[in-house]
């Protein structure tokens, strides 16, 4: 099995504290990663973890630990969302080296070649594996990284056995980096394909979805969440990333400013992307008022669309049938809403399928309170995953940010600049070295970035087709150093 990517992720994790704190450079020009150049506490975790952190023999976390004590990791079930438009719960037992993952909401077909049913409701179990000794620079990083090897479970909708073995790519597998209060990385991917419908007089291949494999889907989950709607009210900046499979996987990244009241209603005056359709109150993340789901998150019907929708022969688009789901994360004293849009398809009745509902736009959004952030206000190193289907690391230092290559631990490309002077509090302007622009937001030790350009090395070839565009770019990360 290839562990090059895990070595790269770990080096990137090391890079964040080392290059800034230990004189190895800055975010615009980081020096080579060399753990021996550091000394003292400024270098963070070094060598094997202490017994409290690594053995699981005591509860709590040791100072400098990247994740809970080994015996305590199982105590947290991470509830979150994926870029696929899925709501997922994940539990890892770091002593038994097993995991349990359940798709609570999903637009991803249960079987390749179909569009329904989805894998919503499927729970799988499998083994986790740490990268081997020596694959990561420190024992602490190895302890907190978990590869989700192929898992399986029974799909109650049709009684079939669902397995992730077919989608597992040894060179770029789903992997979770467990942190303190948060877990991120990638959940099992899938291969998506649909030949389309044959409709009399209209032809065949109607609504076809081209075959595309996804090594994993970027995921962010919280150890602590709430369904207390009183935690939500306020004005938030949001960064959204959606795609439409029936539109040849057309993607979009955009921003929104939205205000929520104590009843879960949303209002906004954000610009609606061309071809999109906001809610009746102008929102891009939220349709109807948020209502609590018994599984620990919120639902909103008639989810807005930010991409053009599939148009059926004779009758045209079928309107909004997708659903939005919000996970209210509680982390580092902040409430951080994570919203996924789950597309919906019902093929309707043959032979004309006039009653079909095809709203397959799905995606993810991170929201952050619209509170002013000064330069340096979210400095640090962040790790996560992005729209390139890569595990990533970013360095933020004042007005400069950098993407670090997982394979070389060097700059992926010239640094991007950050503009803290925008009129919207908490919304930070981003400009890359080619003049492509976008935005960044941050809250509770999490950050999201969206740029209208090709960034961070472009798409991973095993998760893209030959005509898949490398733009726009979207990434989410959790802070692991300051």
Residue ranges of predicted features:
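Bacterial N-terminal signal peptides that target proteins for export
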Residues: 1-10
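Non-catalytic peripheral regions of nucleotide-handling enzymes
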Residues: 11-12, 16
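C-terminal motif of bacterial Sec signal peptides marking the signal peptidase cleavage site
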Residues: 18-21
């Amino acid at each position: 099995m290839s562990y090059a990517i895990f070595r790269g992720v770990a080096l990137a994790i090391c890079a964040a504290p080392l290059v800034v704190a230990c004189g190895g450079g800055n975010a615009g020009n980081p020096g080579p990663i060399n753990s021996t150049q550091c000394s003292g506490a400024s270098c963070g975790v070094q060598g094997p973890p202490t017994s409290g952190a690594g053995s699981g023999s005591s509860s709590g976390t040791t100072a400098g630990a990247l994740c809970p004590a080994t015996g305590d990791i199982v105590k947290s079930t991470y509830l979150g969302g994926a870029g696929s438009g899925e709501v997922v719960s994940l539990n890892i037992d770091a002593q038994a080296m097993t995991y349990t993952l359940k798709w609570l909401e999903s637009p991803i077909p249960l079987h390749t070649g179909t569009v329904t049913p989805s894998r919503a409701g499927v729970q799988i179990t499998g083994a986790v594996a740490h990268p081997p000794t020596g694959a990561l620079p420190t024992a602490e990083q190895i302890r907190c990284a978990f590869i989700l090897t192929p898992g399986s479970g029974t799909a109650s909708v049709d009684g079939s056995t669902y397995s992730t073995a077919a989608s597992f790519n040894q060179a770029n597998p789903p992997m979770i980096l467990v942190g303190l209060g948060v877990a991120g990385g990638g959940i099992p991917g899938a291969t998506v394909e649909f030949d389309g419908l044959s409709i009399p007089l209209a032809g065949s291949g109607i609504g076809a979805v081209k075959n595309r494999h996804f090594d994993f889907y970027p995921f962010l989950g919280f150890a602590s969440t709430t369904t207390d709607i009183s935690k939500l009210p306020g004005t938030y900046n949001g960064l959204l990333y959606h795609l439409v499979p029936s539109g040849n996987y057309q993607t979009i990244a955009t921003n929104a400013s939205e205000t929520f009241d104590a009843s879960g209603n949303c209002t906004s005056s954000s610009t609606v992307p061309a071809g999109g359709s906001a809610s009746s109150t102008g929102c891009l993340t939220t349709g109807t008022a948020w209502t609590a789901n018994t599984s620990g998150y919120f639902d909103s019907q008639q989810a807005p669309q930010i991409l053009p929708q599939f148009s059926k022969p004779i009758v045209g688009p079928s309107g909004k049938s997708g659903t939005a789901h919000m996970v209210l994360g509680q982390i580092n004293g902040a409430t951080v809403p994570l919203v996924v849009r789950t597309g919906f398809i019902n093929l309707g009745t043959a032979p004309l399928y006039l009653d079909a509902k095809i709203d397959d736009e799905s995606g993810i959004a991170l929201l952050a309170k619209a509170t002013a952030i000064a330069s340096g206000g979210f400095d640090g190193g962040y790790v996560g995953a992005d729209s390139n289907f890569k595990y990533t690391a970013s360095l933020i230092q004042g007005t400069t940010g950098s993407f670090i290559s997982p394979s070389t631990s060097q700059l992926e490309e010239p640094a991007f600049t950050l503009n803290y002077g925008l009129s919207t509090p908490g919304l930070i302007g981003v400009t890359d070295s080619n003049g492509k622009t976008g935005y960044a937001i941050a809250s509770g030790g999490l950050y999201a970035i969206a740029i209208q350009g090709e960034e961070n090395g472009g798409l991973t070839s095993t998760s893209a087709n030959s005509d898949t565009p490398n733009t726009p770019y979207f990434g989410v990360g959790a802070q692991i150093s300051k």
